[in-house]
């Protein structure tokens, strides 16, 4: 490709609206342009990268036995009503009415459509298993689109769906996709972690998320420093402490704490170790009453875990303040477990809080706290449970090492759906003995556009993007210095360009006749992995100047040997 014939529209300054580095660099490099809030056009440079990612995905899907299809973006409401998601999905689902007054949506995902597609032609168990996938533009009306294509409203996604006759088959299909996703992200050169995850709105029985580690990630993930264990912080188990609870050493006393409505204020005012404070949260109970959840002041409630408790109402919600005040006689900042047994309020205590002694809690009276409280003597535990988020340094749930907590960008998610959609949509197939079987499904997604942003978040410097060779829009750039003034430079650059083309290399020639500084800045900004500089000075020694984007050192290599040497290195 000749840059004089390419739509390269770079910018020196970062646009004010770009919050994260990937958004800044994608705009500056001329990869994307915003069309509307959360909606972007992909320019030629960006599309080349998008196509590189899609090609790797297709290769690994084909290798794993998945079959590519294309399903419609517009989906009839009837299918979503069959699954029960038409009303459950919420305002993120973009709905519209056609000229015949029929309801449709723009698909954010395709479980319903693919289930309908398969049930139309599935007549024998011999047709299964089957795994269908597509790479398609989706739309989700995010309430707060941000970070460019990382959380846009319109995005490109690879979504796949498997159908199997039994649990063993479903798990086998799931493992194939899990392995394929690992190969994809390995090939893309990403520093990522597959983590145990919650199924969320998709439903099903088991799932893993694939997270690219980056400080700008919106999710927290926990992983062992000594094993492959990794989990979304929502799913990571906090193991019960092994040490016993200390014996009480002080008598409980009630103190006025008029200026202490938060744990932080209490700790600062009385110079307390924060782990000596307990917080009590009152939540809606499954029976219509109230349930108390108690955890250490330095720990955060995990609402996903709390919602799984049989005593707690689904969906999880804090009790209304008026209800709390009517029962307890105090507001949220002054609650504690003392006296709750007499009010028939179940007290579920996190394992870490259950081994505390001589701790501080709210006194169920505004402006007062109890100090030196102890379990059994002063307050009763209904039962203990894991209801908190893990923290860095906690023991790994697999017994190997301790946990690290890092931010992650979710770029992939695989689910074992089971019968969730096939049963709801009456998908059945006759078995050999004539009995009807409801196939078990899996679904598998990769955010293709998000992968690109995540790769930039991990691979950049002050000069721009640093692409891996698998993702780069071009493999090597030829930069002829003062080509408009030197016929020798111009001819040598053209000859070298043709040799690279003949060798099948994705090469770009900067023939725009710009100043050397402009050429260097643009090539660094757009992240080309290697650059070759040709000048009268290098030609005088029969060489070119060669530099890798991710290295500081430059090398002088023979003009006659550079193509062969470059191609040999690219194979390794």
Curated annotation (Swiss-Prot):
It holds the Pfam family tRNA-synt_2b. Gene3D superfamilies: Anticodon-binding domain, Bira Bifunctional Protein, Domain 2. GO terms for cellular component: cytosol. Keywords: Aminoacyl-tRNA synthetase, ATP-binding, Cytoplasm, Ligase, Nucleotide-binding, Protein biosynthesis. The keyword Ribosomal protein does not apply. One of its GO terms (molecular function) is ATP binding. One of its GO terms (biological process) is prolyl-tRNA aminoacylation. The keyword Aminoacyl-tRNA synthetase applies. InterPro entries: aa-tRNA-synt_IIb, aa-tRNA-synth_II, aa-tRNA-synth_II/BPL/LPL, Anticodon-bd, Anticodon-bd_dom_sf, Pro-tRNA-ligase_IIa, Pro-tRNA-synth_IIa_bac-type, Pro-tRNA-Synthase_IIa_type1. It is found in: Cytoplasm. It comes from the Bacteria. Its EC number is 6.1.1.15. It catalyses: tRNA(Pro) + L-proline + ATP = L-prolyl-tRNA(Pro) + AMP + diphosphate. Homodimer. Belongs to the class-II aminoacyl-tRNA synthetase family. ProS type 1 subfamily. Consists of three domains: the N-terminal catalytic domain, the editing domain and the C-terminal anticodon-binding domain. HAMAP family: Pro_tRNA_synth_type1 (MF_01569). Catalyzes the attachment of proline to tRNA(Pro) in a two-step reaction: proline is first activated by ATP to form Pro-AMP and then transferred to the acceptor end of tRNA(Pro). As ProRS can inadvertently accommodate and process non-cognate amino acids such as alanine and cysteine, to avoid such errors it has two additional distinct editing activities against alanine. One activity is designated as 'pretransfer' editing and involves the tRNA(Pro)-independent hydrolysis of activated Ala-AMP. This is Proline--tRNA ligase. It comes from Dichelobacter nodosus (strain VCS1703A).
């Amino acid at each position: 490709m000749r840059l004089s014939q390419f739509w390269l529209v770079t910018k020196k300054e970062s646009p004010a609206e770009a919050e994260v580095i990937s958004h800044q660099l994608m705009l500056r490099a001329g990869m994307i342009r915003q069309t509307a809030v959360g909606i972007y056009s992909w320019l030629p440079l960006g599309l080349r990268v998008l196509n590189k990612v899609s090609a790797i995905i297709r290769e690994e899907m084909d290798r794993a036995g998945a079959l590519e299809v294309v399903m419609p973006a517009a989906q009839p409401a009837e299918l979503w009503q069959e699954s029960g998601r038409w009303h459950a999905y919420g305002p993120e689902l973009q709905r519209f009415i056609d000229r015949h007054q029929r309801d449709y949506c723009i698909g954010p995902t395709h479980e319903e459509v693919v289930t309908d597609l398969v049930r139309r032609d599935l007549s024998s168990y011999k047709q299964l298993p089957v795994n269908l996938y597509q790479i398609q533009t989706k739309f989700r009306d995010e309430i707060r689109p941000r970070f460019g294509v990382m959380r846009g409203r319109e995005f490109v996604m690879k979504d796949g769906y498997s159908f199997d006759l039994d649990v063993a088959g479903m798990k086998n299909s799931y493992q194939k996709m899990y392995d394929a996703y690992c190969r994809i992200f390995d090939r893309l050169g990403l520093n990522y972690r597959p983590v145990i995850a919650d199924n969320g709105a998709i439903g099903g029985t088991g799932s893993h998320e694939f997270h690219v580690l980056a400080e700008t990630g919106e999710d927290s993930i926990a992983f062992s420093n000594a094993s492959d264990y990794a989990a979304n912080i929502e799913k990571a188990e906090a193991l019960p402490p092994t040490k016993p609870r200390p014996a009480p050493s002080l008598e409980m006393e009630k103190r006025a704490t008029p200026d202490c409505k938060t744990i932080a204020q209490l700790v600062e005012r009385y110079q307390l170790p924060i782990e000596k404070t307990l917080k009590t949260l009152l939540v809606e109970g499954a029976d219509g009453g109230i349930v108390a959840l108690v955890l250490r002041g330095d720990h955060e409630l995990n609402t996903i875990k709390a919602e799984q408790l049989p005593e707690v109402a689904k969906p999880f919600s804090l009790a209304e303040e008026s209800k709390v005040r009517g029962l307890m006689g105090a507001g949220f900042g002054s609650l504690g477990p003392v006296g709750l047994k007499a009010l028939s309020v179940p007290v579920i205590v996190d394992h870490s809080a259950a081994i505390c002694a001589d701790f501080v809690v709210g006194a169920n009276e505004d402006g007062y706290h109890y100090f030196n409280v102890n379990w059994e003597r002063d307050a009763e535990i209904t039962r203990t449970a894991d209801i908190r988020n893990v923290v860095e340094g906690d023991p790994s749930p697999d017994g190997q090492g301790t946990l690290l907590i890092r931010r992650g960008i979710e770029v992939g998610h695989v689910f074992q759906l089971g019968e969730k959609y096939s049963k709801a949509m009456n998908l059945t197939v006759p078995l050999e003995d004539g009995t009807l079987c409801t196939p078990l499904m899996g679904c598998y997604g990769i955010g293709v556009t998000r992968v690109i942003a995540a790769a930039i978040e991990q691979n950049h410097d002050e000069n721009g993007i640093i692409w891996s060779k698998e993702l780069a829009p071009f493999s090597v750039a030829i930069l002829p210095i003062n080509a408009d003034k030197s016929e020798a430079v111009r001819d040598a650059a053209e000859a070298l360009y043709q040799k690279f083309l003949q060798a099948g290399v994705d090469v770009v020639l900067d023939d725009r006749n710009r100043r050397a500084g402009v050429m260097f800045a643009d090539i660094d900004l757009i992240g080309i992995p290697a650059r070759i500089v040709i000048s009268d000075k290098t030609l005088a020694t029969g060489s070119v100047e060669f530099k890798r984007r991710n290295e500081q050192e430059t090398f002088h290599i023979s003009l006659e040997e550079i193509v062969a040497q470059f191609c040999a290195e690219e194979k390794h």
